[in-house]
């Protein structure tokens, strides 16, 4: 597993592990590193089958296998407790760890995640799969921003969109890996177990998310035993990239506050 450590390097520094979504790249969190670096040791990593970790996504195990990769990183860093922030699929990884190893996670942050995939999200993934299988990698990568960002933001960041597209094609994780990762997030379902998770959790959702209806975030906040809901009107699926200052402020307020488990 390829991972990087940023921010504080003191042995006693609080650690937060950041886990990205379907793309799997640790570089997704670039807009958060500086803001978190004054308070935390930050661990970012490339998911198995992606980026500098590479390799193949396991045929079995689903989200739990991806969570085991995080536990491997924690063991290598000798972490007995850490905070965890996950975007979409990364949030599912955090929920899995919170269920199986609750003693490890101090605080949990979920960004446009879910306890059970919404039918609308399934429709979006069907479209993306069809693009990949019928039109190829370039079409799949070209369509990806439509599910991540608001239209006005894409218009204002056209050069970035073009650069991201070139990078996405050049470093594509492979059709088999993408399909297995999509299958894992679609199969994830802990909806009837949410109340078992007592980890203090910040649930971040955006009303203009095209891929994941914000009602999935509402469901998480209602079902978890110690959750705070932070809804935004603007920012779409990748709200931490689109509105980093507002997002980072919410996250830091939550992480710095004393926990009150209800």
Curated annotation (Swiss-Prot):
- Record function comment: Involved in pyrimidine catabolism. May facilitate the hydrolysis of carbamate, a reaction that can also occur spontaneously.
**What's one Pfam family here?**
Hydrolase_4
State the Gene Ontology terms under molecular function.
hydrolase activity, acting on carbon-nitrogen (but not peptide) bonds, in linear amides
Protein name listed in UniProt: Putative carbamate hydrolase RutD
Identify the PANTHER family for this entry. Answer: AB HYDROLASE-1 DOMAIN-CONTAINING PROTEIN (PTHR43433:SF10), HYDROLASE, ALPHA/BETA FOLD FAMILY PROTEIN (PTHR43433)
Q: Where would one find coiled-coil regions in this protein?
A: none
Q: Which Gene3D superfamilies match?
A: alpha/beta hydrolase (3.40.50.1820)
Q: Which family does it belong to?
A: Belongs to the AB hydrolase superfamily. Hydrolase RutD family.
GO terms for biological process?
Answer: nitrogen utilization; uracil catabolic process
Report the enzyme's class at the first EC level.
Answer: hydrolase
Here the disulfide bonds are none
Q: Kindly state which reaction or reactions the protein catalyses.
A: carbamate + 2 H(+) = NH4(+) + CO2
- The organism encoding this protein is Rhizobium rhizogenes (strain K84 / ATCC BAA-868)
- The record's EC number reads 3.5.1.-
Record key words, sorted: Hydrolase
């Amino acid at each position: 597993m390829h991972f990087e450590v940023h921010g504080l390097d003191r042995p006693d520094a609080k650690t937060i592990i950041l886990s990205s979504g379907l793309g799997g790249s640790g570089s997704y969190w670039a807009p958060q590193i500086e803001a978190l670096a004054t308070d935390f040791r930050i661990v970012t990593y490339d998911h198995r089958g992606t980026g500098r970790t590479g390799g193949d996504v396991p045929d079995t195990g689903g989200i739990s296998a991806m969570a085991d990769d995080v536990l491997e990183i924690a063991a290598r860093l000798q972490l007995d407790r850490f905070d965890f922030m996950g975007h979409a699929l990364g949030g599912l990884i955090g929920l899995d760890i919170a269920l199986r190893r609750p003693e490890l996670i101090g605080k949990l942050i979920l960004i446009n995640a879910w306890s059970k995939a919404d039918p609308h999200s399934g429709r979006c993934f069907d479209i993306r799969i069809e693009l990949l299988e019928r039109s190829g990698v370039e079409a799949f990568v070209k369509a990806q921003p439509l599910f991540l960002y608001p239209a006005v933001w894409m218009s204002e960041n056209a050069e970035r969109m073009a650069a991201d597209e070139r990078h996405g094609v050049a470093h594509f994780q492979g059709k088999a890996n993408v399909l297995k990762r999509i299958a894992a997030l679609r199969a994830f379902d802990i909806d009837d177990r949410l109340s078992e998770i007592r980890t203090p959790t910040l649930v971040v959702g955006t009303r203009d998310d095209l891929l994941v209806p914000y009602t999935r975030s509402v469901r998480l906040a209602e079902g978890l035993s110690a959750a705070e809901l932070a809804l935004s009107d603007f920012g779409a699926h990748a709200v931490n990239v689109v509105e980093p200052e507002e997002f980072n402020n919410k996250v830091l307020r939550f992480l710095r506050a004393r926990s009150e488990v209800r």
